[in-house]
Amino acid sequence: MNIRKNFKIKFIRLFKKLSILFLLSSFILPSERNSSFKFSQHTDIDSWWISNNNFGKNFKESFFDFYHTRTLGKAFFKINITNSYSSNDIPKFGETYLRYDFSKNTHLIAGRFYRTYSNYMNNELSSGHMLISNNARPMPKLGLNGKFKIKRNKDVYFSWGISHAKFKKNQYYTDAPFLHEKFVYIHYNFKKKHFLSVGLAHEAIWAGTTTEIGSINNPGNQPDTVKDFLKVFISADGPLIEGEKHANALGAHSGIWDFNYFKKENGKELSIYYQHYFEDTSSLRFANKTDGLWGIEASNYFKNTKILLEYLNTSNCCIDPPYQNDNYYWNYQYLDGWKYENMIIGNPFVNNGGPRDELKLIHLGLSYTLENKKINLKMSKINKTRWQSDYSNKIRYKIAYSFFIQSINVELFYGDDKKNNSGGFNLSYKF
């Protein structure tokens, strides 16, 4: 049974019907809604932190964004329309989705959205989540999420989710592959001020049709039946390919062990986290040691200030071949790797220069707010990389200052990475 075309047709039809129905009813019935329009103007050469972690948008000299959110009963709708995804100014959807709450603990979400786990992440200041950051345009997805509590202990609960998404055709894929996503977390609340969560998130590229250039081994139609999906779900082995010593897992897999400690007391917040990255059984068992993203964020320890410090390590990806020998975000069959529309889906520093571009990175994020004024700073420095260059250890930063003129929010920004420097402004109006 081939499920690729069948799923695509049904998903598109369902999302269009739900979107039209929701929009029409939201204008008729009472609801909570917010709308805003944003115009941006800046130089045509982009530095690192202006072109990365900005929702995959192609920052031209000028572009616009329209945002709208609406709550109607058990339904929530978010829409972003922008011309920054097209070279010819054609408006396209950014983060746009419909969420429907079946109950207090279960909801369906459909459209273009990022992730529904690792909610502790500060996407505005972070260098980027290890699996799904705001670096690329959100993929079209259909997901079901929920949570349930332990009856004997009200301080413990589980959260879970499963999603199905689709990539796009490109030079590597004549028929775009699917993305399978799932996660499960356990959360513990201690004395209502200490929170601990531990979870496992899993992503897998599967199905599709790869080209000769797009697949070093076994190009052509990739396994895509329901039986194959079940293998992808449990990371079971696919067929043995000629020349290989053993069968590999079906599809291209990646995931994280996700640890977070959160404390809230006297108006102050502290979050400590570690995302241990893995792509196979060996790295799942920590054979790649401390690879992944470490972070700490402190809020209001200095009044109206958020300080975030992160350490990114990918230097242990290939320390024990063939046992521990992962090219993070890359795959021998799905050669476009962990990308969507030519942008890395996860942390933009990971293998951005190509396979085995191992690195150690320090990242600082800072935010200060006073009344209607705000300053944001992001600063990153690679301390070690496999492919050393004069550019590798340079500081890359972006600073932004925003304020209000009547009802218009004005943001001025400047970025520099020692190769390029660029600046500009954003004007936002909420109505």
Segment roles from a protein language model:
Residues 1-32, 427-431:
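Bacterial Sec-dependent N-terminal signal peptides
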Residues 31-34, 68-77, 104-108, 149-158, ...:
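Short loop/turn motifs that connect adjacent beta-strands in outer-membrane beta-barrel proteins
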Residues 31-70, 247-255:
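Outer-membrane beta-barrel initiation region
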Residues 35-47, 79-85, 108-114, 158-166, ...:
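Transmembrane beta-barrel strands of outer-membrane/channel proteins
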Residues 51-54, 82-84, 126-132, 168-173, ...:
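Extracellular loop and loop/strand-boundary signature of outer-membrane beta-barrel proteins
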Residues 76-170, 174, 178-207:
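Outer membrane beta-barrel
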Residues 195-257:
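A conserved mid-domain beta-alpha-beta active-site/ligand-binding segment of alpha/beta enzyme cores
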Residues 240-431:
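Outer-membrane beta-barrel pore domains
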